[in-house]
Amino acid sequence: MKILIDGQTLLTAEITRGIGTYFRNCVEGILANDFSNDFYINSIPGAHLDRLSSWAREKLCLIDDPVYDIRAADRGKKYRSEQYSNSLNNDIEKRGIDLYWSPNALMDNVVLPTRQTSACQFAVTIFDLIILVMAKEYAKHWSSSALTSYEKKLELLKQDYDLFLHISRHTRSDFTRLLQIENKQHVVTPLAAGGSFRPYPFPKAPAINEYVVYTGGFDPRKNMDRALEAFAVLQKKYVADPRIQATELCLVCSLDKVAESRMLRRAERLGLSGKVRLTGFVSEAALLALYQKARCLFFPSLYEGFGLPVLEGLACGLPVASSNTSSLPEVGGDLAVYFDPYNIDEMADGLYQALQAPMDYQSRQRRYDYSRTFSWPETARATLRAFADCAGDMRPKRVA
């Protein structure tokens, strides 16, 4: 079987974010598990292919065409999309590709190609449908042209794509319910925490720093304002508890000077002066260190396609206080404390409960062991099985 992996993600900012984590781990897992199929990637030389391991790059055949440089500023979006689709379908025909896979289809900075051939199956990974689920909130933040483009992509998925890989059962449920796509293949291929995420590597835990770690941002679904309010309620409700009073809230997210100033002013108004720490963007190594020495993870997101920080926190042995929405209970299982992310008092109570959770070696190890029930190798194997099933539906049987 010949499989073509769409390489657009390599040319976008997403390569350093969650989508990029999925792309790298899934592609490398597929290549490590498969020795019978041929793999291609369409991109341009130097397109961050070095984000993949050298052995993985050696197993990929690069289909190089300037049209695949989606960053080109001299092309309008419609023209770029048409040219990309034409070149892709020509390469599919020319090389006899059996299955094309788009690992990142719905971001506004990538092209979702149309299908012009019946000789190849089209597969796509779906991370979430936030723009539909939280339409009112996102209508304020997206331009009308971006929303129109998103809607057109959804229609194209219904029309041209055969296999849908969903990163959670909840995402699959949202997708089939909202788009009413039942007569296609739907397979759940969950995410996983990276191998570096694990409890502090000594038999005895270090002295726990007095902070709660929050990973999120200024995206409306990340619920940062309510997170601050809930932390303020926690401080007021347990004013006689010296350990709670000594606990800070560590906000891990990218932010500019204006946003930083706004958050600090808001913290001051809530009586949290000196109790809120803003890290800005951090590397994976720095994030790991923050997780390992925190008292718990606070994840009050309104909606997630998966919720990787919950799994990363558990992998580091942390108690987790999480929203009870979307896919998050699916990810945290029985080991997280859940709350209604629209109810500030309930958020504060959930956070307090997580702060009381045991942090002995056995408890941390139990959280870590649970996190490892999600694994990139298994996700890669499930993806490969889905590819084989999908392509097997249309490939002619060989005559002995």
Located regions from the model:
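Carbohydrate transferase catalytic cores enriched for Leloir-type hexosyltransferases
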Residues: M1-A400
